[in-house]
Amino acid sequence: MKQVLKVAVSFLMLWAAVLHAEVRIEITQGVDSARPIGVVPFKWAGPGAAPEDVGAIVGADLRNSGKFNPIDANRMPQQPATASEVTPAAWTALGIDAVVVGQVQPSADGSYLVSYQLVDTSGNPGNVLAQNQFKVTKQWLRYAAHTASDEVFEKLSGIKGAFRTRIAYVVQTNGGQFPYELRVADYDGYNQFVVHRSPQPLMSPAWSADGSKLAYVTFESGRSALVIQTLANGAIRQVASFPRHNGAPSFSPDGSKLAFALSKSGSLNLYVMNLGSGQISPVTDGRSNNTEPTWFPDSQTLAYTSDQAGRPQVYKVNANGGAPQRVTWEGSQNQDSDVSADGKFLVTVSSNGGAQHISKLDLVTGAVQVLTDTFLDETPSIAPNGTMVIYSSKQGLGSVLQLVSTDGRFKARLPATDGQVKFPAWSPYL
């Protein structure tokens, strides 16, 4: 836990303003078909009320994954705090084969000891499948809960949890000196803070491979420019400000390169910068428009959008150049793709018959699945464990963030309370 906290502490920046108007997940579809589980309210072993409802956070995480459906506390046959207090038969009677129990205990030094146990109620009744404890200060209680959620999720699903990840996005507010804000929040919308404020548009945030930096597009100089901002100290480095368009940054998974699109020669084309030397090399060169690069896990191959066949479609090409290969064939156009961390699938904005939705393309079988049914969907970004996609869509007169599971069954919304929200980007594991 200490090592994890060292990584996460870089986000507690003195210069960042923590916001109260936060986005929160509202589930809209799919939790009823998920696996039932018991997450018992964690026992509070101190005076007064607990500073955080850790059990509720764990339950919300598991529910937000789309793979689990925690039962309501009023339906629980008992509320044990330890594995030894669990009566397995009482839970299996409700169709529940695993129960999470835990407690939070205050310490004399002002810290808190958070402990949990994951208990099997059917296969080997009473067996503890996973357990851990974390000593944290008050501000890290939510993080401790997310850590427990990650461990429970991985034990039960075999998939690494992503509840300690973050999302970056751009918020446009009405009026004020700085109506554009680049913000970062926990994956569930909590602990939101401002990374950068601007009087001019901000676009296309992209995370570095280690989660310590964000690249994005700014128009503060009067024209587009690409910058990289270090989250720990706020330092901003300009990496591209050529004539015409500079946009669509994407860090390679190995952290050594940044791909982006420039139109300095007329048409939009892809370029790659070596982040060590600063050298910029062209990837594509032609009269068609080539943009929106995203990396495959080998850090050598790019998926991107091109109109070389007339309408926008997704292609792939070696980052050192070479002949492009078309990837998408279904739908009148496909654009703004994101490749999963394992390289097995990509998601894209697909247009067909006037509709614009997020689709998933299985890169092994070629199967295509439309994941969303919202309006004018844009800019999908895949969670690092490949289970969820965050994207923006139109709702009323504004833009909001939406979540959909990569099997299409679970859907949720993160409604904004103080502006239009666009360009979501899911962080790597932190």
From Swiss-Prot:
The keyword Cell cycle applies. SUPFAM superfamilies: TolB, N-terminal domain, Tricorn protease N-terminal domain. GO terms for cellular component: periplasmic space. Its main location: periplasm. Keywords: Cell cycle, Cell division, Periplasm, Signal. One of its GO terms (biological process) is cell division. It is found in: Periplasm. The Tol-Pal system is composed of five core proteins: the inner membrane proteins TolA, TolQ and TolR, the periplasmic protein TolB and the outer membrane protein Pal. They form a network linking the inner and outer membranes and the peptidoglycan layer. PANTHER family: PROTEIN TOLB, PROTEIN TOLB HOMOLOG. Part of the Tol-Pal system, which plays a role in outer membrane invagination during cell division and is important for maintaining outer membrane integrity. TolB occupies a key intermediary position in the Tol-Pal system because it communicates directly with both membrane-embedded components, Pal in the outer membrane and TolA in the inner membrane. This is Tol-Pal system protein TolB. The gene is tolB.
